[in-house]
Amino acid sequence: PLGMQLDQNNVVTSATFANAQYFLEARPYHENVKFWSVNPGAELLFGAEQDIKLNVQANATRSWLARESPSILVTSPFTTVDYRNEGGDRPSITSPLDLNDPNLGWGWTGGRVNIQNEKRQTETRGARADLQFGEDKRNVKIGASYDMAERTIRGFDNSTAWEQVVCRGNGGNVCNGGAGSAIPNAALASYLKPGPGGFITADFSRFLADTNYYALRDAAPESNSANTGASTGGIREKNLGFYIETNAEADVWNRTMRFNAGVRYVTTDQTITGPVTINGVRSVQVLDSDYKETLPSFNVAWDVADKVVMRLSSSRTLTRPDPSAMLPNTNFSDPSAQTATQGNPNLKPYLSTNVDFGGEWYTGGEGYVGLTLFNKRITGFTVNGIRRIPFNDLGVNYDTLLPIQQAGLAQRGGPNAATVDVQTQVNADGVLNIRGTEAIWVQPLDKLFDGLGFSLNYTHVNQQSEGEGVPAVAVGVAPNLWNGTVYWEKDAASIRLSYTWNDDMVISGANQNGIPYARLNADARGQLDMSASYALDWLPSKPQITLNITNITNEPLRTTFAWPNATYDLYEPGRTVMLGIRGTF
């Protein structure tokens, strides 16, 4: 770098970079998805007054996904780049090169190709039954449910074999486009073409056909991860739940109060599998875990005036832990056999204790004004920790260990007695408190224009953490957000214009790129959308013609790295227009 200038946060604001290179990383995606679902059910009424109701339901789904995403990376000639970061949503990066010219002199030095495919299979099965005694306003309900979900992810990688054909000359160790390469440097330009965004792209059909891609893709061996970041492995989860619930209605000070309370008991059994490579030997490891929770809840609504309702509710909810942190991913390379790294199948779920208090004032028709105060107290966050476990619980075959590792275990009493310190994700003791306010106003304007109306919604969130191992904030939660909708609905026609706004928000944990304080942040953003429909009432089943326009003003999505002027990425999703017809038969 020449003449580099920094601001007070050490963010580069200007510089000249000599001996710089651009690179193209082109990656076409091809996905094939299959899915089926069946969901039978029935409702049965019993009793002399038909006030005993039995609802039964079953469900089953299965889906398959196959994704291929070959990568081609080529580099430009060395050049001098002028960098300016002096305002705006992105820095200015200029050079004398025409980056949309396939004949610029693009080459393989520093380049690569990848064959990285992914297959996923998901299967679910479930059944539930609910038995209600009494009418809908006053009753007791009991029920049970069973759910099974199984997901398998498999990554495949044949990059080295493809590189041997494309640019290593069938025998080299470096991708340099030398003699014997299917696409040598001299021919590379003919496999490139101008791109739609002012930067070259690849002629994928020719490139893949001339480099034996399809045969190598089909022969790709399984790898421990996919290029999407997902780890190879599977998880099977079985949930069994029981609940009892009561609904009641009574007069309190001559005002109607509606009450709902219940408790749910849930048990979860998980079986987690994944590949483990120890000293060059690859095997599949199976880990089991289970947990159970009791989840109470209640809701009270009281008509304190003719058009005013006050509400109070509380509940305890459960969110499953991250499956990727529970996969084995065992590494046991310590010569002394004292330490290892591994996923933790025994991670406990996130638990949230929730309290909401608020009310609504009904102004007539569909109109009302509402205000709610809410609090969520969340536990179950994870941090890196150490678990000391018996060697036999590590899931590693003793016969695959090196002699020096077997000797280390023997010095500590042998494989049946020795313990191992495992670095893994563990549940932290801290708590994250999320408190907030939500206000809503829905108002028909029929007196001004028949069918016209609007709705406004505003939410403010404040977050505080207590104890160790808890993030300062929950990622992806904006401190302020609001949306407004203007609508017109009349007979067969309707149209809605909506605007949504989110404040700046944190979207990642700390320690990004090894910088302790660095987080990724999303810029504040507003988006305008429209939806409209018209029902063809004179046709059978009254089909609707629909029009949906998303992101009318073409707003971009921008994220920054720690500081507002350090652009991390800028994504322009564009404007989406969908015209369709919807009906039943």
Language model regions located:
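Outer-envelope beta-barrel architecture signal
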Residues: 48-56, 136-140, 255-259, 306-308, ...
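Gram-negative outer-membrane beta-barrel transporters
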Residues: 375-377, 382-387, 394-511, 582
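Outer-membrane beta-barrel transmembrane strands
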Residues: 1, 21-69, 104-158, 215-258, ...
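C-terminal beta-signal and adjacent terminal beta-strands/loops
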Residues: 377-380, 503-510, 534-585
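Extracytoplasmic loops and strand-loop junctions of Gram-negative outer membrane beta-barrel proteins
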Residues: 19-26, 108-115, 178-179, 187-192, ...
